[in-house]
Amino acid sequence: GITHFDLANNYGNPYNGSAEENFGRILDRGMREFRDELCISTKAGYEMWDGPYGDRNGSRKYLIASLDQSLRRMKLDYVDIFYHHVFDPDTPLEETAHALDQIVRQGKALYVGISNYNAEQTERMQQLLTELGTPFIANQPSYSMLNRQVEKDGLDQYAVAHGIGLAVFSPLSQGFLTDRYLNGIPTDSRVGRGNTWLGEQLNEELVSKLQQLNTLAERRGQTLSQMALSWCLHNPAVVTVLAGASKKQQIIDNCLLYTSPSPRDRSVS
């Protein structure tokens, strides 16, 4: 079953924090009794509230306040993993590291991680947290068949060599690596609803590439999304993929990955 749930303080629509509130309500529907079997993570680092301390940053004040708010929204005593969501060039990395360490020592998180840090930034953060004795276990980067910056940067190699897991987000590249855009733009898709940034990327070249990948997936007895997740998991640095969904069937289809060719099958590399 699915036991890992990844959130962030700024996730949600129509307002920041609503995803955590919704998750808290879901826990109340019979899941809270299984808390010890769940891995719940959240993040903070992007703009969250008005004012000088609610903007994008990695300060001690912001991170601790943000996690306290997240715990209240989810009605939890602690999270399993707390991530600094994005590298902040305006805050000394030492301050961010000390904030993460304090959060663990206060019992508000069991482990800490970082997100959107490159290999060099990850190495420096690991050095600081190792000196503090803080359980630093993961980096959360964007990674997919269409975005291989993790490999170009050497982050995956560093992670394997130093015992850090990569929990990758956008493994389906914002929905491109699914069957959604193979034959036009559905009206209920992100592009169909007017997402300009995604719409600019969906050109003829990308559609042709997606159709070729879909043909390969069919030969493997998989959907395009299942093959895309398999591709991510073939990288030994990747410990989990974080796949969002707007419909229940999307979750079910992705879970069927484990009934098709091995997710560690390297033939899609």
Language-model regions: role of each:
Residues 74-89:
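Active-site groove signature of glycoside hydrolases
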Residues 59-72:
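Short, acidic/polar
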Residues 6-7, 41-42, 114, 168:
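Hydrophobic residues in well-ordered beta-strands that form the structural core
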Residues 50-61:
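Active-site mouth loops of central-metabolism enzymes
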Residues 87, 91-257:
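Beta/alpha (TIM)-barrel catalytic core signal, keyed to glycine-rich beta->alpha loops juxtaposed to Asp/Glu
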Residues 5, 79, 112:
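Glycine-centered flexible beta-alpha turn that most often forms the glycine-rich phosphate-binding loop
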Residues 1-38, 105:
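N-terminal binding-site loop/beta-alpha segment at the start of enzyme catalytic domains
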Residues 258-269:
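Single conserved hydrophobic/aromatic residue that forms the stacking wall/gate
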